[in-house]
Structures are given as C-alpha cells and as structure tokens.
Amino acid sequence: MIITASHNPPSDNGYKVYWSHGGQIIPPVDEAIIQEVKKISRIEEIPYKELSEAKKTGLLQYIGEESDQYYIGLVAPMALGSKDANKKLGVIYSPFHGTGGRLVPKLLELRNFERLKTVSEQMVPNGDFPTLPSPNPEDSKAFGLAMEKANDDDDMILTNDPDADRLGVMVRGKNRDWQWLNGNLIGVLLLDQMLSSLQKTGGLPPNGVLVTTIVTSPLMSKVARFYGLELIQTLTGFKWIRDAALRAEQSGKQFIFGMEESHGYLCGNHTGDKDGVWAAMAFAELGASLKAEEKTPFDQLDLIYQRHGNHLDSLFTISHPGEEGKQKIFRMIEDLRQNPPSTFGGLRCLKRVDILNNIETDLLTRSEKPGPGLPSSNVLILEMGKGNRIIARPSGTEPKIKFYFNLNGDEMSVLEDKLKRIKQELQEFQQQSG
C-alpha cells in the first residue's frame, strides 16, 4: 500500500494497493477487498498492533539506503546515452515536494549530468505541497518555480509528481523559449529513441510488445509497428498495462515498453508500475544526445512526423460540479452514444466503438459487430477515418468528462484549425444535451 495524493491536491490524499506482481490491483482482487471493508461496521472491529509489537514481529520493516542502491543498480544499466554528452546538458529538476528527490539527482549525477540544478524549495518532502496549487506534471503551470530558476544555459526542466511515477518535461523551443511537452510527445520520443537504439545494436526482439491505453496517441502504434513490435491496447490506468504485459510474457512475448498519455512510462520489468525516476534519466539522456548533434527534441519530432505523418493530440475537459452536473455529464455521453453528430470539425463520423456495451457500429450502414472485448467501462470512441478520432470518458472520481482528440494527416496548422472547430462544436453539443 502506498499512501499518497499522487499528482492531485493534498485534499485528495489516499492510498494505492499493489499486488504480488508489483502492479496495482484489478478485478476481482479490488472487489474482494471492498467486500471485506464493507463487513466492518465499527472502527473498533479493525485489528491493530502497537508499533513496537509490529517491529518485533516483522510486520513493520524500514526501507533503507540499500533499497535505493538496488534500484539504481537495476536502472542505471538501462541508460542509452553518453556520459560525455550528458555533462553538457543543463537540467533543472523538481520532485514537487515528493519522493523523486531521493533518487533522481543520484541517478543523474551517476550518469554525469554535471550541470544539474534542483528547485531547492520543492526538494523538501511535504504533503501540503506549499509551493504548488497542484503537484501535477501534466499542468504547465506547475513548472513556474523551476522556470524562475532557469538561466539561458539551461536546456531542460524535468519534474515528477510526488510519488514519482509520472514525468513532466519542458524543453527549449527553436527560439530558446520554454515549451511544455504533453504525455504523448514525451512517450513517442522515449519509444523512438529506445527502439532505434535496439535496432542499431541488433537487440530488437522478434516477439516484442508495446502496451498502451486506448486514449494514447495512434502515433505510438505507428512507431511500434515501424520497428516490428506488436501493439496491445488497454483501458486507462497503468494497472491494466501491467496486467497486459504479464499476460503477453506468459504467452512467450517480450514486454518492451508501456505508456499512457497521462505522463506514465515503463521500460521492461524492473518494476510493475509506471516509473518517473527511470523516465527522468531516459529523457535527460535523449536531450543530451540530441544536443550533441546540435538538435532539439522538436527536431526529432519533425523527423518522426516525416516518417509517420503529422499528429496532433489534445485533451479537453468539461466540468459540471454537483449532483446536477453529474446528471448532465451522464446525459451528454448518452446523447453521444445514441445520437452522435454526423460530423465534427468537418470530419465525418464513420464508426462508434462503445466500450461499455462492447459494440462497434458502422455509422453509415448502422451495422453492428462485437467491440474490442475490453473490460466494461463508460468510454465511447468516435472514429472519423485515417486515424482521426474523439474519445469521450467521464471521470470516475471527479465531476468531469474528458475528451481525447487524435488528429493526423494534414499540415499542423490545418490540424490545429480542425481541433479548434471540434472543441467549439463539442461545447455546443453539450449545451444542447441539457
């Protein structure tokens, strides 16, 4: 069990439950635990031990420096960069008042990042996150203090959320201005670097597997297939990625990489959950290698787009607080499920994939067939051909509905215009949904 607010505000503090395989629990284990919780009617019914007794019986064990060294010993050999290149990259790091401050600086120093700077105010563990409205690397506003620390010689800002399983990145743009990278861009850069390196050394396995979620950019699958990897898609949440990776390996395949667009990444099996510490090292080395070639991450993205076409991925959230808002969100996704618009942003809706009911519908002929067979979840996918799509997913914990947009195939300016139109039309649709 890990007690954490993760990337959320302090008021959202809770805990994550992990199983023996190192990943978070999924059905039926989570349901069985809840049933046990429901049996308790009074707090006095919960058995407890004194701290001293728990220590004596071995139920309480403290993790020391040896665990840090064990982890670093596993992860450091996974580095793909050059120590000579690393020492020339200016990196600023913040753990957002969390656990990453214990390991990331050690790992980067071991890899010869001599120009590493840390945000001292955020290196101190503090569950109130006093310098941040929300310690979320998915939010560019959280990088404010790190940006204040930067000078002209700094090339990159790396951040972790407080439990250090997510990675946030800012890099210099072509005019040396700071540019925030979304989770899809970070992931595709890491994946392309890793697979390119394996290909050069002859290390690409013939049975390699990439695991992503259904809301992750289709560009990830194009990169994976270019290098000969099989793609497996899961529901959102890294617990599903871990489950799929284990199943793949049990069938004789080799799990290479897993990612979700919400800034979670994992290479191999050194852990059973997304790993922001390894990802910080990996992205820093990617940046150093590119700088040694007088390139930036944006130059590398341009090369990836030349190979696979331009891609624009975006998340759009509509919030409706309270019970009335909850009902409004329900009506909106039901309207999309039953009567989707014929077009969005000038793109014709061709197919509807209903994960909740496991039905795939051709919107031109109205013919139906079984869906992808994922666990039932209130997710709706509208496909508009050539990899363009909208995915709607109500939040399970907040009064929000999230829309994931994946557009590709045109000039970036055209894609940006389509995205703007789609967002506007969605706003109009949700107003009509009452």
Regions found by a protein language model. Name each.
Residues 4, 393-395:
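Short beta-strand micro-motifs enriched in acidic
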Residues 75, 79, 84-108, 112-114, ...:
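Long hydrophobic segments that form regular secondary structure
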Residues 11-17, 38, 45, 52, ...:
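Short acidic, glycine/serine/threonine-rich loops at helix termini
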Residues 154-156, 177-179, 197-393, 400-404, ...:
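Phosphate-binding and adjacent anionic-ligand microenvironments
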Residues 8-9, 95-101, 164-166, 216-218, ...:
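Gly/Ser/Thr-rich loops at beta-strand to alpha-helix junctions
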Residues 1-41, 135-159, 164, 169, ...:
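Phosphate/diphosphate-binding loops
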